Each structure stands twice: as structure tokens, then as C-alpha cells.
């Protein structure tokens, strides 16, 4: 894997950004996070065969319009040959047919969902890092523990 895309909508957008950042820090792979609502305004041009795309799906029990829009995004991504890694609530049958890999999280409130969605992304980044040869994921190269603002 040379690059990965991460998509999220609503509270899932910052989760997508965090997932991309964690993958860059641990596996040294190019990754970008995007707002799913912006997919047709540029990021869709990056979609190609076998490109891994992680999608953070909002709860179907929250705002139904957000859920249906991201299911549509996943369909568009799959139609272009990408491989989808979908993080969704347990029992979300709407996304199952379009997920190459489905990572299920327990159902919760919309504002708590980012906490549950972030953990699988951290494990994913750690696993990919190890597969890429970075066995010391607790000490990523070139990262500072603090930043000095001048």
C-alpha cells in the first residue's frame, strides 16, 4: 500500500483526519482525510482500482440523511474499483454489501461515536505499520513530543 484515503461525514470527518494522520505517523504511508460531502469536488479523482479507502459511517439511528449520503459515497467508491474498509455500527446492514472489510463498533450516541470509531483506526495503523516493517510503533521517527510556538 502506497496511499490510503479516509472519508467521514459529520462527527466522522475529524475521525477520518485522525485515521490518516495516525497512518502517516506509524506506517510512513501517504494518507489523506476528506469530508465525504466533498467527494465529488476533487477527491473522487484520486479513486482507482484497489485503492484502500476507509469510510467512517455515521449511525443510521442519528440523522438518516447523513447515513444515506455516505452509503451513496461508498457505492461510488466501489464502482470505481477501490477497496473499502468501512467502520459502522453493529447491525448496519445498509453498508455491508459495499464493504470489502467491515469493522463494527457498538451503537452509541452521535457525539460518542468518534471515540469508538477512532480505536479501530489506531489498530489498523499499527497493523499496517508492522506489515511495512516498523516494529517500534511507540516511537515514530521524526515526531516531537512537544511543539514550541514562537
Task: Label the model's feature ranges.
Residues 1-150:
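A SIS-like phosphosugar-recognition module
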Amino acid at each position: 500500500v502506497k496511499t490510503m484515503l479516509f472519508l467521514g461525514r459529520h462527527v466522522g470527518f475529524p475521525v477520518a483526519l485522525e485515521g490518516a494522520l495516525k497512518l502517516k505517523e506509524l506506517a510512513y504511508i501517504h494518507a489523506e482525510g476528506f469530508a465525504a460531502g466533498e467527494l465529488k469536488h476533487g477527491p473522487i479523482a484520486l479513486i482507482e482500482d484497489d485503492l484502500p479507502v476507509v469510510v467512517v459511517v455515521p449511525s443510521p439511528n442519528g440523522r438518516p440523511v447523513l447515513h444515506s449520503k455516505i452509503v451513496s459515497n461508498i457505492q461510488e467508491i466501489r464502482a470505481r474499483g477501490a477497496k473499502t474498509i468501512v467502520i459502522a455500527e453493529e447491525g448496519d446492514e445498509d453498508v455491508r454489501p459495499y464493504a470489502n472489510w467491515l469493522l463494527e463498533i457498538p451503537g452509541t450516541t452521535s457525539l460518542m461515536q468518534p471515540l469508538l470509531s477512532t480505536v479501530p483506526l489506531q489498530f489498523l495503523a499499527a497493523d499496517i505499520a508492522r506489515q511495512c516493517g516498523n516494529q517500534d510503533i511507540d516511537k515514530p521517527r521524526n515526531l516531537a513530543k512537544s511543539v514550541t510556538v514562537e
